[in-house]
Amino acid sequence: GRDRFILSHAPGETADQLWVSIPTRQTVVIADYFQPFLPNAGNGKRRQRYVESWARALREMVATQPELALPMHGPALQGAATIASRLGKQASMLESIATQTIDGLNRGIPKYDIANRVELAPALATDPDAAELYSTPGDIAKTVAQEYSGWWNELPSEWNGSDRSELAQEIVQLAGGIEALHRRIEKLRHTDIRLACHLVDLAWLASPTDARVLQLAIDVWLQRLRTTEIPTQEAVTYVEHLVTLRQQRDAIVTR
């Protein structure tokens, strides 16, 4: 027929991702590039995602001046102005996170600190399409940092480190033993749940067959899920860990 389908390759959620322009229909098929929430560019359990290329693809789609955009998430977008606004804002979100991350890397700021500091400007952060359903700006920053600087977490001891359980056992001993750590975790879980989670992980790694430690870990991670707003992927990670903890506890209890 008379319609031309123009396929454009732009790494985004995957390395082989494509979007399609149909000029005669003033239409773009935008696949997973646009999502009606903060783009899922920060999944810590997947291969590399390409934040800068993702943003460029959104800009290129807007440049075709489509009247209809067909995403794989959410309903169709209609009207050139609406499409330009929504795709443009998401491009700005990704560009801002990438720029802040790369600037931080160039200034020698540790990757962990960059992820904790990255934030969107208020006008972008309050936009409905910035809802943190799957990823946070910090998650996306970690993806950008990995693309530019690899998997190392910048702690020299962890390039080729000790066994995690041995390290945890040493830290628990320095803390005064598992009972002392248990008391500290119980106190912290009511004031600083994130720190409590770090410590309960150490307790679990040091004593993975202690039913009391396993129950404490279950209680703390359940509290983390209940008391904070958590994006889906982060919540799934905690739920999967809870399943593991419960299986380990039940195996001990039923012996």
Feature map (PLM): residue ranges:
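Metallo-beta-lactamase
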Residues: R4-R107
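Accessory terminal helices/loops
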Residues: A63-L68, A76-R255
